[in-house]
Amino acid sequence: MEQEEYLESAENRLEYVVDDIINKSSADDRMVALLEVLTETEVVPDVGRYYTFVYQPKTPRIKYDQNPLIACVSVDRWGFRGLNYHWGKFRNYTWNEIVGNLHVIYPLELRDARSIPFQHFLINT
C-alpha cells in the first residue's frame, strides 16, 4: 500500500470493538485482543506509519514497554526508531528483539488504539 493511500484510508477496525478490548482484565489480554483485530502485518515498518508489536529486549536491567504503540520515524540496518505513545518519547527497537511481526494501525485507528491501556512496562532481568 502506498503512503498516500495509507494516510487517506477510512478504515477503522477498532471502532466497534474498542470498549470490549478495554474491558479485558489485563494489559496482555488487551494486547491479544488488539492483535486479533489488527491482522495486517509487516516485517519492516514504513516511516510515517503506526504500529504495535510485542517487544522483548536483551539488555539486562532496562525498563521497557512489552506492547509498544509507535509512530515509525526512521528505519536502519539495526532496527528502527519510533515515538512510543505509551512513553511519550522516542525509543529504538532492534530487529532481533521484536517477537513476531509489526501490526499496522491506520491513522483513523490511532485515537482508539491510544485509548486502550495495553502498555506493559517491565524491567528486563
Regions found by a protein language model. Give the residues of each.
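Short, charged beta-turn/beta-strand-edge "cap" motif at the junction between a beta-strand
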Residues: 56-62
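Mixed-charge, Lys/Arg-rich low-complexity intrinsically disordered regions
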Residues: 4-50
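Basic/aromatic-rich interaction segments and small domains that mediate binding to polyanionic partners
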Residues: 63-93
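Short, exposed beta-strand/loop patches in secreted or surface proteins that constitute
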Residues: 43-44, 71-74, 97
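Intrinsically disordered, low-complexity, charged/polar segments
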Residues: 84-125
